[in-house]
Each structure stands twice: as C-alpha cells, then as structure tokens.
Amino acid sequence: MNPIPSWPGRGRVTLVLLAVVPVALAYPWQSTRDYVLLGVAAAVVIGLFGFWRGLYFTTIARRGLAILRRRRRIAEPATCTRTTVLVWVGPPASDTNVLPLTLIARYLDRYGIRADTIRITSRVTASGDCRTWVGLTVVADDNLAALQARSARIPLQETAQVAARRLADHLREIGWEAGTAAPDEIPALVAADSRETWRGMRHTDSDYVAAYRVSADAELPDTLPAIRSRPAQETWIALEIAYAAGSSTRYTVAAACALRTDWRPGGTAPVAGLLPQHGNHVPALTALDPRSTRRLDGHTDAPADLLTRLHWPTPTAGAHRAPLTNAVSRT
C-alpha cells in the first residue's frame, strides 16, 4: 500500500491557494487564457500535493538534486556548542537481560547536567555479535551555569564526560558491564568510498546500506524485534530520548535503523513501521552514527510506558573489548 505523507505544511497550502483562488474567481472560463490558467493551477496542485510512496513529488525532486550535488559523505559539522560522549554497555552479571531504559533516560537531567538527547544504539551482525552504546549529547546553552561553575573557559567536553562516567558507574553498580568509549572505537556505518543511490549507499555489488526512519509509536515494541529478525550482514538500531519542549517529566522519542545487505535494497520498507530514507541516506546515516550530535528525525511524544515495554538486546560477553576486525574504515 502506498503510504500517505504527513499533512501539507502552511507553505505548500499557501502556494496552492495562490494558484487556485484566481482561477476560481475567473469562473466561468471562456477564453483560451482562462483555460491556460486553469491548466497551470491544476499542474501546481498536482505538483505540490501529489505523492508517491509517501513522498511529495517536490520532495522527490529535491532529494534527487541533492544526491547529484553530493560527491562525498556529509561530514559532521564542527561545533563547539554541542558534544556527544559515549558509554559502551556489556552483558549484565545477573540473569536479567533487559537494558534499564528508564534509568538511562533519567540521565537527561542528572547531577546538574542536562543532556539534549540520550541515544541507545545497537549494532548486530549476521554472526549474532551485538554491541550497544549509550550516547549523551550535551549542549552548552542548556548548561551554562554548570559549565561556568567548573571553569571560566566553559569545559563542555569535560562536563559531558563527567555525566558519561557517572552513568557508566551507575550501570556497573546494578550489575552491567559499562565504560566510556572513545570515538575511534565505533565501527563506521558506511565506507568512505560508498556511492549514494536513491535506495541506499552502494559500496560494491554485494555491499549496500539503507537507512530507515522508524515510527516511534505504541507499536515500537513489536517493530524493533521485527527489524532484528530481518536477514542482514549488519543491523543498526537507535532509540533517541529527549525531554518534551518546556517539560522535565515528559519524553519525546525518535527511532531509526540501517540495514547492511549483500543485495540492492527494495523500493518499499522491509518491515511495517519503517519509512525508507529514499534520496536522503547520507544525512540519515550521518545522524545515525553514534558519535553524531544531530538529532534523529521524527521526535514524537512518547506513548505511556513505552520505555518499560521496550526490550533492548543484551550485548554478548566481551564484545566491547574485542578488536574491530570487521569495522569499515572511516575518512
């Protein structure tokens, strides 16, 4: 079934009205000029409201042109006001196999340090190896008082590292293996010489990576296992948590995934609840990288008890201390 895009924005509706209203006021149409204006108005309506596979025609055209303009991967923009620090999570010492998402989410505002987002990312390979990271993105503007209290030079990176170490300590106290992770310990999603196509990133004829936005709704606890069950060389899944605007108690969530396969991705989503990032794979995969400071697309208010209903896979023992033999080199 062809998915329906979101409700048209004000700009799109305004442009359509600018084309339709003059034609409607000219009724009845009698001259050739009137019919030309009618045809132009019809073309504008189709061009702005028409869609295919959940994307407006104008979005398809814009993304197609963006692919042509991009000659290499988008580099993460350098910034001194945002930083992301990572904590790797290993298997628990006890029999529990449920990652404590509600506990992790409380580190959005902990010990006087407020995180813009917390993201849990897992990478699962075809051999069953699972690795999990928790990323805390800290923004200087949200933490000026805490930063100035530590030093006059605003030590953003050091402050974020403090939050990461405290989270790792907390996880170890309740029985999980955990520790801070260096950026170069994270395997790359995409090879530097990959080429973007409409359906994904192509490295070789047997190496494709496709990005998908995941609907963060009440069905998410069923969607994530369905993604993990899909055959793939690598499966990347990320869940991002943030505070709702103006609130310190309500959460918004967003989710995304990427599948590395040895066949060309199909034109439709492989699992219900996924939206292919057609023509937008480079920006989507750049944001999906655990080291990214960008937010994932699609933040929505978290359904009630969502975090308690989500089952996150348990990493395998020693995975985070193993050499990255299969990691793709980065630029």
UniProtKB/Swiss-Prot annotation:
One cellular component (GO) term of this entry: plasma membrane
Membrane-crossing ranges are 11-31, 37-57
Question: Which cellular compartments is it found in?
Answer: Cell inner membrane
Q: Quote the Pfam families the UniProt record gives.
A: EccE (PF11203)
* Keywords noted in UniProt: Cell inner membrane, Cell membrane, Membrane, Transmembrane, Transmembrane helix, Transport
Report if keyword Cell inner membrane is assigned: yes
Specify the protein's topology with respect to the membrane.
Multi-pass membrane protein
- Keyword Transport listed: yes
Give the top-rank taxon of the lineage listed in the UniProt record for this protein: Bacteria
Job of this protein? Part of the ESX-3 specialized secretion system, which is important for iron and zinc uptake or homeostasis.
Q: Give the multimer and partner information.
A: Part of the ESX-3 / type VII secretion system (T7SS), which is composed of cytosolic and membrane components. The ESX-3 membrane complex is composed of EccB3, EccC3, EccD3 and EccE3.
Give the family this protein belongs to, as stated in its UniProt record: Belongs to the EccE family.
Protein name per UniProt: ESX-3 secretion system protein EccE3
Q: Which organism is it from?
A: Mycobacterium tuberculosis (strain CDC 1551 / Oshkosh)
Q: Which gene encodes it?
A: eccE3
